[in-house]
Amino acid sequence: MSVEVVKRFKGNIEPGDHPYLQGPWSPQHEEVNADDLVVLEGSVPTDIDGVYLRNTQNPLHQALGRYHPFDGDGMIHLAAFRDGKVQYRNRFVKTKGLAAEIEAGERLWAGLMEDPALSKRPGWGAHGALKDASSTDVVVHAGKALTTYYQCGEGYRMDPLTLDEAGIPDWSPEDGISAHTKVDEHTGELLFFNYSKKPPFMHYGVVDKNDTLVHYVPVPLPGPRLPHDMAFTRNYAILNDFPLYWDPEALKRDKHVVRFYKDQPSRFAIIPRRGQPEDIMWFEAEPTFVLHWLNAYEDGDEIILDGYFQEDPMPTNYDGAKPGYERMMSYLDQHKMGTKLHRWRFNLKTGKTTEQRLDDRIM
């Protein structure tokens, strides 16, 4: 095995006992290429030919206050498989925010758990004061890897084989691209949504296999929301409006206070993949919040959607957490949120929703 250090980045993370800055979460500040990795046990099948890409959070600079793992700078890790051998390389996602902080030698933007007033420059995303770290997801579309940010960012492209930079997509809209885009392997299309604090509060878009934006429509909501993921079937896209969102009264004071409104229903927008706002069918269901979807498909007049239902989207503080991190640790504990596999069935003829718990285990 040979290892080449391509570049070392100078960071200023202070040593400490933060649970998400040590062990497997320790920041990695080197970009490397490694050929012919050592196989510790067994062998790599010779018929595997392709690459595995993973997006991770690797903060380079000390947080302005309390660090949350979602704040870390994006870093793509690549494992390439061919002829029974594996190569590895990693690269930072060279976002505008990261470039500015490298030049300044310090953190310039507040994070998820910090006061937005700490930000030293205007930010990105629905929040408006955060750094677009492009550290949430990575998909491959139109021959390029596309990285995205959890509260809507510009999206950054890379070569999926070399991780060379390929810039921001020309079609990236003003309100950005959501955390999780979806690629239809049958049509080559990329489906996405975004959201903001201004009407209509959400948009839905389609980018064709040639990387051209061919569809972009508003999905009107009652107010600012915090959707994270979407799903799709052969003919429909599925978006959501969950009763977990910023307190409207606090927003008037520029305070981003997340609350769970348990007396309000979950709402699902089902729209034909090239549909208009008037084509949207809205369905209601039990109040919850779903961070990620598992699957969706059509079955006769129904659309079946599987995802992870949170029994308590606003859990109590995490006992034993480091002072100041009680809330963060509670959100990162699936047991406290009661996250369980759930199924929704939407009848397109009757407009009714039926629900079913698929497993009582915490997922």
Question: Predicted regions span which residues?
Answer:
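Beta-propeller domains
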Residues: 1-363
